[in-house]
Amino acid sequence: MGYDYALVHVKYTIPLAALLTVFSYPVFTRLDVVRTLFIVTIAFVATIPWDSYLIRTNVWTYPPDAVLGPTLYDIPAEELFFFIIQTYITAQLYIILNKPVLHAQYLNSPATLPQWIKSGKLVGQLALSGSVLLGTWLIAKKGEGTYLGLILVWACTFALFTWTITAHFLLALPLACTALPILLPTVYLWIVDEMALGRGTWAIESGTKLELQLFGSLEIEEATFFLVTNMLIVFGIAAFDKAVAVCDAFPEKFDKPADALAMSLLRARVFPSSKYDMQRILGIRQAAARLAKKSRSFHLASSVFPGRLRIDLTLLYSYCRLADDLVDDAATPEEAAVWISKLDRHLSLLYKDPDATSTPLASKYAAENFPPSALSALDMLPTSLLPREPLAELLKGFEMDLSFSNSAFPIADPEDLELYAARVASTVGQACLELVFCHCQHGLPDYMKAYLRNTARQMGLALQFVNISRDIAVDAKIGRVYLPTTWLKEEGLTPEDVLKSPNSEGVGKVRRRILAKALDHYGEARDSMKWIPSEARGPMIVAVESYMEIGRVLMRNGGSAAADGSGRATVPKSRRIWVAWSTLMAA
């Protein structure tokens, strides 16, 4: 009886697992629990027969004074725990690194699959098949290559299966989502294993190994083992996540979302890719790209929303951003007015009838009147879950922007500022909440939903005031001043002065007044967010806090923005992540 192997866990594996658990805890969902249990169970069950064979045939040994004693099929308890802890560590890292990624956008049908992915899948199949054959030959040959052969035959057979059913999805994902969860735990375990082998905690029997070391005492067989097992873990979770992505991307095919853990998830796993609605996938892809490019704060917050709600919120953001860009990027005020009119007409067609008969009319109108790059955002707006009023009011906010083109400054007083912010931001806040009500299980009575709608609109005011305070210099470059003229007058300024010198001391004082109003609205609405349905509460608070942090940075700077070169105040990415993590811990 000894404690050497147990101490390896105490010193190296358990602390790392605990650290990853603390980091992932705020974003760890019920679906993540199932992911982890799924892959840990498979890894544990699949490894026991193989490892037991190694020990019984004396390929792999443990000195009696290095282990505690209890065994299962001759496998020491510490080794059994290693199966679990290694899988858990790799799974946690995979989950953390994949949170920012909207997996649905990486689905492909055979018709849309890039050639390099097709080739990559084939290369992987050939490499894994070759590894199985090499392993078979080494086992048959017996002698020094036996242990490596047993590793290759066992691991690469499973890997070949999961690669075959998941490679198209795996290869489409960013490398950070797949390569890092394999490589980082592998290198860490190489270091741990090298120290353990050097101390004799466990040993590979002479005559069954190649006597080659990757570095130090680390045998090439052990290095291969950790690499291929971490590949198996990532391949297995990716196979699970592909089913989740399919289930969430196509609500018309699967009545229950993936996080409901219903039969829909199993059906999604075998749903043929040839039946994917690729117009929808391409639309989701474009919407996700627009969100990532245009709003770092909301993109970060979107990472922690549940699947279908995340998709619909992304589509809503894409529509609102597209509409804003069409108006802002118009060459003339007349062109901008035309875009607003077309957007209003498109909304009228979308909401013309309670059934779907108007959708083809809206799609046809969009195809005839909007650029091709706009069509997916227009067609995929989730109107079946949204009332028309907030979207129509948003267009009225764009109409206020047109007043600037007539050499007029429409924000004459604080009431105009509130009206403008209500139209362009409170509306979006309410629309987001409507999607939450549709996607999340709740028993909220109508009066409470009305109360939360008012709260969302008030929080929208706070966020828009922060936005205005941040972008004074940016807006001045295009001839716009959203600061109330009456407040400017109190500082001896006019809107024209802001255009000439947007970073003056007087402008800074007005900025601070707007930020103070933003914090007032935030303070009045923040506590009410505790009544938002639990699935969306934390993510919604993250969205708010990530944006309000910009306001706090501006306040700490005395009202003058630290700019990123475009005139916009910035919050470092590390700070945004900390705000999101700490917010979720407290939510």
From Swiss-Prot:
MF term (GO), any: intramolecular lyase activity
Source species, domain of life: Eukaryota
CDD domains: Trans_IPPS_HH
Location of the region described as Phytoene synthase in the Swiss-Prot/TrEMBL record: 249-587
Enzymatic reactions: all-trans-lycopene = gamma-carotene; gamma-carotene = all-trans-beta-carotene; 2 (2E,6E,10E)-geranylgeranyl diphosphate = 15-cis-phytoene + 2 diphosphate
Region named Lycopene beta-cyclase: 1-242
Transmembrane segments: 8-28, 35-55, 77-97, 120-140, 150-170, 172-192, 220-240
Pathway stated in the Swiss-Prot or TrEMBL entry: Carotenoid biosynthesis; beta-carotene biosynthesis; Carotenoid biosynthesis; phytoene biosynthesis; all-trans-phytoene from geranylgeranyl diphosphate: step 1/1
Principal subcellular localisation of the protein: membrane
Membrane topology value: Multi-pass membrane protein
Keywords carried by this UniProt record: Carotenoid biosynthesis, Isomerase, Membrane, Multifunctional enzyme, Transferase, Transmembrane, Transmembrane helix
Family annotation (InterPro entries): Isoprenoid_synthase_dom_sf, Lycopene_cyclase_dom, Squ/phyt_synthse, Squalene/phytoene_synthase_CS, Trans_IPPS_bact-type, Trans_IPPS_HH
Family under the similarity heading: In the N-terminal section; belongs to the lycopene beta-cyclase family. In the C-terminal section; belongs to the phytoene/squalene synthase family.
NCBIfam families per record: CarR_dom_SF
Job of this protein: Bifunctional enzyme that catalyzes the reactions from geranylgeranyl diphosphate to phytoene (phytoene synthase) and lycopene to beta-carotene via the intermediate gamma-carotene (lycopene cyclase).
Protein name: Bifunctional lycopene cyclase/phytoene synthase
Lineage: Eukaryota, Fungi, Dikarya, Ascomycota, Pezizomycotina
